[in-house]
Swiss-Prot record:
One GO term of the biological process aspect: protein localization to nucleus
Compositionally biased region (Basic and acidic residues): 361-370
Gene3D superfamilies to which the protein is assigned, alphabetical: Ras guanine-nucleotide exchange factors catalytic domain, Son of sevenless (SoS) protein Chain: S domain 1
Disruption-associated phenotype: Poor in phototaxis assays.
Pfam family of the protein (one): RasGEF
GO CC terms in record: plasma membrane
Coiled-coil segments on the chain, per record: 5-35
Superkingdom as given in the UniProt entry: Eukaryota
Keyword Signal: no
Keywords for the protein's UniProt record, in alphabetical order: Coiled coil, Guanine-nucleotide releasing factor
UniProt-annotated stretches for the region Disordered: 65-100, 114-150, 166-387, 414-437, 451-472, 602-628, 907-935, 1004-1037
Domain Ras-GEF positions: 726-1003
Protein name, as recorded: Ras guanine nucleotide exchange factor E
Amino acid sequence: MDHTECNNRIEYLQNKVLELESLNENLKGQLEYFQTKFLESNLNSEGKDISSCLTEIYNSLSLDNNNNNSNSNSNSNNNSSNSNNNSYSNFNSNNNTTNNTKVIKNRNFKINLTNSNSTNSSPYIFGNNKDNSNNSNNSNNNNSNTELSNDHLSLEDNIATTNTTTTTTINTSNSNNSNNNNNNNNNNNNNNNNNNNNNNKPTSNRPPVAPRSFIRSNSDTFITPPGSPTSSRNSPTNKSSPQFLSPLSKSPLSQSTQSTTVSSPSPSWTTTVPQSKMRSETIVQSKSPYSPDTNISNKLINELASNIGAPNSNGSESPSKNSPRSLNSNNNNSSATTSITTPPTTSTPTPTTSTTTTTTTERRPEDRRSKTSPFPNVGTTTPPLSNSAHLVRTQSASGANAVKPQSQLSTSCTVNMIGGGGTPRSNNSSNGSLYHSMSSNGLIENLSTSSSLSLSSTSPSPNNSQQNLTNPFEIGADDELEVLDDPRLVMVKTENGFIVKGGTIEKLVNRLIAKHDPDFTSAFLLTHKSFTTSIELLDLLIEFYVNNKDSSSINSNSSSSSSSAVASSSFSNINCNISDLSSSTSSTNSLLINSITNSPIINSNNQNNQNNNNNNNNNNNNNNNQLEINGDKKKKAIRLKITNVIKSWVDKHYYDFSEDKQLTLKLDQFITNHIMFDMDKIGFNLKRLLTNDRVVPVPTFTQGPPTPIPPKMKSNGSEINFKDLDPTEIARQLTLYESDLFRKIGAKECLGQAWNKDGKEENAPNIVSFIKRFNQVSSWVATEIVRQEKLKDRVSYIKRFILVAQECRKLNNFNATMEILSGLQNSSVYRLRKTWERVESKPLLKNTLDELMSLMSSGANYKNYIQELHNIHPPCIPYLGVYLTHLTFIEDGMKNVLTTTTATTTNTTTTTTTTTTTTTTNTTTSNNNNQQQLNGANRSFDDVIINFEKCRKISVVIREIKQYQQQQYHLHTEEFTLRYLSNLPSIQTQKSMYKLSLICEPKEKETSSFDSGYGSVSDRPSKKEFSVTSLLNSFKS
């Protein structure tokens, strides 16, 4: 493999990388668009499901696409008609043909593409210089005239270049100078009209769609890159154009497709205008990885044009980009496709035309981070990708008129003055010196000055002008690595990506708004009261919202003033340089220079410079307007995200507002003054949620509730006792009663071990009530058993309680099951050996008890119970003691604060070390330390790194509790049974129950018959698995 082929392969692979990067950015932009539209549709909807929202978005794309297609067609026609009247340089045409001229304007030059009739038209052109030169030599009758003219030039130069294959000639005459002002004025008027038309175009919110897949040829094999020996385009016998299959229609593309090809020693690019566009092809034009306003095809064509002046591989210098070129392309095969071939030239100096405004592209390191806006550009289409024998980039003709961004341009103004009949000399100097060349009397052969006339003026950069528009929390997927270096936000990488481990309050709110992370949002809103207050959180959200308001006049004044300053400084520098030049020459030369300065040529040049500056001002204003539109779209997306956070907060955590009237009033004022002003329908929905005017979901059941079982009524009218109630109905009514208590538990009651601290009746009233109910039922079970003096009655009561526990298990009431088993394991009941001997003598009853004991066993951290809980279908009532135990371990074992930003900056490993979970033996000391950490850093959030990992673990427990609170039981109330369970009979204390137990079965010697049959008490694993004392102590206040 030779050196040339290797370079071609490298360039081919680099181009493929650019295509893949563009495809990736298109997909990112499309995803951001759908997320934004889904948020907006979700905020406006009233009970719509996801599929309905997505269907509306999809239908809106169809309508936007049809409108945009009609607009783009009309705009392209207008541009074509305007460009035919405003061409400055005309090519020599030897034959009279009817030409259809199209204009592709690219910043400071435009290409007039003149297509003539031909019998052969190919939709794609291979970028082979050898083939192009052969085709141009075979041209006789039909002309394909191509004009390459500068927007602000009127002079035509006669340039003779030496080349063995193609000769390029431009005739220059001084008679054209008199037409400068008229042509420039007409051009300025047309440009202003085009700018006004572009500004009046309706904006579209359609998403950028990924380019089409690679277009393969008839064979499925990989296409050889350009320059390889096996490439089909190098074969001299290959005369016909290859057939390309469309990925949408799976048929060869129509040959009536008009395209424009720029051929050069490097791979060429094609501008294609298909006759008809499908909706997936013309949804929207994506942004290139190079600039926010141009697509890939235009960018690469601009780079190709800017590299013409650089030395080529043969060591010869290509013509300068500053001079316009007229190429006579006599190719009879290019009627539908006009190619501009730039041949290699010798080192002969190339002249520059009068008053040239050059555009240089600054080379910068490649930035592969996503620059995709959540909203697409206006009036552009997606360039489909192709995979032909060489790289072919296609786009619509209307998309070729995109203006390059000002941030990557530096405008240089150079004055080159020539006398009558003189030949201009090429400006090969890098400092842009002023050259005078006159042939009359040979007075001045070559005169140059050391003072440069090259004025470099940088127009306002989009980055600089949009500093106020950028939001401080726009964190994309590709920016996570930068966030890792932020000392105020601690992040760790997991299998599912990066997660937040800690951060300041501002950074956490920043992340809450910027990233669509339901887990993070839920964890933050559930646990925010552990490190801040609801009022302060609302203040931060309001601040972010107000800072992202639309601003329509941020860039207009600054851009106009800077442009006028550039224009004035341009003329002052020119006059200064001319005066310096006249002072440094002899008197004879000074007279000549004065006559040159006052000549009509210089006056017309000054007029041209003024027109150029006016056009630049118009372009700057258009760019600034586009930047402002894009900035407003980003701000609108940010405001939608903030509004969605507020909606989630009010909808799913309304208890924060129902208990804080000041918070409700402040949010109501914010909705009225800001959200309803920007988005009235969304504001109305938020107000409805804030007033708790929401639709309460009514559960629907496929089957009716079971028929209640009434108790056995006594004939004498005495009170009902436990034996009169049915075990199944006891389980049902017990479940209904405890379900109401469980569903009242709020998320804030689970924070900070509020159920174990002072003021628990106020901070966690529902958890305290639930714990009291658990202890009450357990004591009631034990009391009912020890009150029975007869052995037979005690066995009967134990049997009934086991049956009630079994029915509670069938109803998924694990809490009641645990209550009954705790009562059976009470020390006063457990010591009744004779009673348990009778119970275990019944195999069916014993097996049922063993199954329940095994299910609710505390071994392996309640492994069997947790596994069963996750396998059942709600409704259910979980055993609350497991959740309270987990919350206690998290609160005691993890700190509330990781470290400060200063410590994080100096030592990064300290942040990671402090997140390790440590178990403390003194619960009171740990709680006091955590509280002191928050109180010591009270409201100084700039220095506090909140341990969000602790908040996340707490939120996991709270979310599981809330998950089982959603669905209610479908049971009827039985009045007598529920009244009995609500007012349980008098319950004895532990000492009283133990005395009753001694009455039932007095203490016996260790050699009793019971001990001889079962051994010691420790030999009964099914009964010894529970420790009633530990259970009761864990729920004591």
